[in-house]
Swiss-Prot record:
Keywords: Ribonucleoprotein, Ribosomal protein, RNA-binding, rRNA-binding. Transmembrane segments: none annotated. It comes from Synechococcus sp. (strain RCC307). This is Large ribosomal subunit protein uL6. GO terms for molecular function: rRNA binding; structural constituent of ribosome.
Length: 179
């Protein structure tokens, strides 16, 4: 039995949860999310809380118990508060800007790299070097932030590239010349 899965997910005000079988729909001020949970768990709602429990004692359902509880908790938090990830762009001439729903990144290539924001995700840029990816779906926000970082990952010698805010880059010493 999962320790995380035992805790019920509290539902804040202005958030509504609909459960039909293994499909969970969550609506709130930041948007609406829907997810189909895997087999082996049962979901119920009572007293402004959602409870996830394993449907049987098999290993697979016990493994998925904590996962499903966390997925529901992230959906509730996403539609009430939202999620965001910040990325720093480091390097001479490296910059970003938003054009409509597109993020345009100049990262040392011969052409600027354009990224479309998927449904439910927004890009914001401060000072041309700080990109904020925000939205209600934690998984989608994390994937889009990883795609932005993947345009030019930080390199270990000078630290140039796109990194998450607060990420530590392992630095290496350069070659030592002949003496």
């Amino acid at each position: 039995m999962s320790r995380i899965g035992k805790n019920p997910v509290p539902i804040p005000e202005k958030v509504s949860v609909e459960i039909s079988g293994l499909t969970v729909k969550v609506k709130g001020p930041k948007g609406e999310l829907e997810r189909v949970l895997p087999d082996g768990v049962s979901v119920s709602q009572a007293d402004n809380a959602v409870t996830v429990s394993p449907s049987d004692t098999s290993r697979r359902s016990r493994e998925r118990h904590g996962l499903c509880r966390t997925l529901v908790a992230n959906m509730v938090e996403g539609v009430s508060k939202g999620f965001s990830k910040k990325l720093e762009i480091i390097g001479v001439g490296y910059r970003a800007q938003v054009k409509g729903k597109k993020l345009v990144v100049s990262a040392g290539y011969s052409h600027p790299v354009e990224m479309d924001a998927p449904e439910g995700v927004t890009f914001a840029v401060e000072n041309n070097t700080l990109v904020t990816v925000s939205g209600a779906d934690k998984e989608l926000v994390g994937n889009e932030a990883a795609k932005v970082r993947g345009i030019r990952p930080p390199e270990p010698y000078k630290g140039k590239g796109i990194k998450y805010q607060g990420e530590r880059i392992l630095r290496k010493a350069g070659k030592t010349g002949k003496k």
